[in-house]
Amino acid sequence: MIELIEIAPKVLGLKILGKISEEDMHKMIAACEKKMESAERIAVYVEVVEMGGISLNTLVEDLKFVLPNLKRFSKKAVVSSSKWHEPLIKIGDKLFPSIEVRHFTPKQREDALKWVKE
């Protein structure tokens, strides 16, 4: 489940609370498109409370939106107590150098929010 979080006009805020469904992905894409209506580039804040997985179809939906819009994303903050995100972030840095991605622990949540709004 994805919960939308209001952070700032140019920041898409997401909280992940379990498995991400296609419905969640459509909700996230709609929120992203709305942010992009009023900003050329946006940042993304993702707080992972619990990661319950994502289906291949849902992942494909995400990629179909994200890939053509890569230059519209400036940075991404990932807040998670899990360390498994760090290797993915390093891979993402190599594949998508135009998007700065940083991992933060839950104790660093305020730092993540400050950074993503800069």
List each language-model region with its residue ranges.
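Amphipathic, Lys/Arg-enriched alpha-helical "gate/interface" segment within cytosolic domains
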Residues: 1-118
